[in-house]
From Swiss-Prot:
Protein name: Protein-glutamate methylesterase/protein-glutamine glutaminase 1
UniProt source species: Rhodospirillum rubrum (strain ATCC 11170 / ATH 1.1.1 / DSM 467 / LMG 4362 / NCIMB 8255 / S1)
Described function: Involved in chemotaxis. Part of a chemotaxis signal transduction system that modulates chemotaxis in response to various stimuli. Catalyzes the demethylation of specific methylglutamate residues introduced into the chemoreceptors (methyl-accepting chemotaxis proteins or MCP) by CheR. Also mediates the irreversible deamidation of specific glutamine residues to glutamic acid.
Primary site of residence: cytoplasm
SMART domains assigned to the protein according to its UniProt record, in alphabetical order: REC
């Protein structure tokens, strides 16, 4: 079976992605601005010190992506967020916060309120300026979200500045994997006939909201007996809080995985930040192992190691779900699951915050279905309840 993704259109507004940096530290604003503007596809058009100033800046600038600090005087990030989205509903907001339990809680709440992504911010300006991981995450998240926003609005793709001038390229000509995918057909493969023994989920940008939706819908439909393993791209501390939020939404035991945990049916296991989570067979039981092998697709935890491991441990009896996220993590592992006889499904482009991971998985020919987010839980439950 073949389906075709919607072709991205152009134009009305091209040039670099227009960004606003919001942080009460002038030093941090300066460092983030410099990092962003080193990439010619990004332009920082506003830099302000609190949430109130950020809301006011929307009246003066056409802003596409906001880097929003949490703790600020006058108006903090969580208070500013709904005001920003009210003024500019298509705005993409990245919550930037240090790795504390309180900030992780606030960030998860912000994601539920409409923020698109979170970014772990080093605690000192020295760590920010010297951190290549932070620089990479900052730039790539801005580009992914800015590009996704323009595609959704039918605008021109992000383009580079050359000698101070804007060099415009239409989406169809953009030599990026995402733009190429938008014009290629997707071939679907038959789903496995067997009922899966495990459900594996991978997600990144927009993933927490998508996970809450899927698990909330599954709870309404009757929880399956299979265990569920989840890799969501998130730093340590944040995944701890995520597990707690998911448990409240799903109504089943949910926890960050610990090395050596036996896998139990009806439980959800979340890969902890900074650790890959994989499944191993030990005698007659399956267990979870954690490792700090090198990052894959710039991520640890990454989805591909999990998917490879469930294919090895369970063979055909795997259902894998790839939700919204930037990059292509999960696509290679998804192909291995499919070639082992398991079933892989992906979230569709219109319902994804960023159609990177699910798009790559679909385009590589691994999927048996590409579905709107609202239909994923029903598919999972049908598969889980096969006789």
């Amino acid at each position: 079976m073949t389906i075709t993704t919607s072709e991205a259109t152009s134009h009305t507004l091209g040039g670099p992605i227009r960004v606003m940096v919001v942080d009460d530290s002038a030093v941090v604003r300066g460092l983030e601005t410099r990092m962003l503007e080193e990439d010619p596809a990004i332009q920082v058009v506003a830099s302000v010190g609190n949430g109130q100033m950020a809301v006011q800046a929307l009246d003066r600038h056409d802003i596409e992506v906001v880097i929003l600090d949490i703790e600020m005087p006058v108006m903090d990030g969580l208070t500013a967020l709904p005001e920003l989205l009210r003024k500019s509903p298509n705005l993409k907001v990245i919550m930037a916060s240090t790795l504390t339990l309180r900030n992780a809680e606030v960030t998860l709440k912000a994601l539920q309120m409409g923020a698109s992504e979170c970014l772990a911010k080093p605690t000192t300006s020295r760590e920010i300026s010297g951190g290549t991981d932070f620089r990479h995450d900052l730039v790539e998240k801005v580009k992914a979200l800015g590009g996704a926003r323009r595609r959704a609005l039918g605008r021109a793709a992000p383009t580079a500045r050359a000698g101070g001038a804007v060099v415009e390229r239409k989406v169809g000509a953009l030599p990026s994997l995402m733009a190429q995918r938008a014009q290629q057909p997707i071939s679907l493969r038959p789903a496995a006939e067997e009922r899966p023994d495990i459900i594996a989920i991978g997600s990144s940008t927009g993933g927490p909201q998508a996970l809450f939706t899927v698990f909330g819908d599954m709870r309404k439909g009757g929880w399956p007996s299979q265990p569920i393993v989840v890799t969501q791209h998130m730093p340590a501390t944040f995944t701890t809080i995520l597990a707690g939020h998911i448990e409240r939404v799903a109504g089943v035991p949910t926890a960050e995985a610990k090395d050596g945990d036996p896998i139990r049916g009806g439980h959800i296991y979340i890969a902890p930040g900074d650790y890959h989570m994989v499944v191993e067979t030990r005698g007659t039981e399956k267990i979870l192992r954690l490792n700090q092998d090198p990052p894959e697709s710039f991520c640890r935890p990454a989805v591909d190691p999990l998917f490879r491991s469930v294919a090895k441990a369970y063979g055909r009896r795997v259902l894998a779900v790839v939700l919204t996220g930037m990059g292509a993590d999960g696509s290679k592992g998804g192909k291995i699951i499919a070639e082992s006889g398991g079933t892989v499904i992906a979230q569709d482009e219109p319902s994804s915050v960023v159609w990177g991971m699910p798009g790559a998985t679909a385009q590589i020919g691994a999927c048996s279905a590409v579905l709107p987010l609202k239909d994923i839980a029903a598919y999972v439950l049908r598969s889980a309840n096969k006789r």
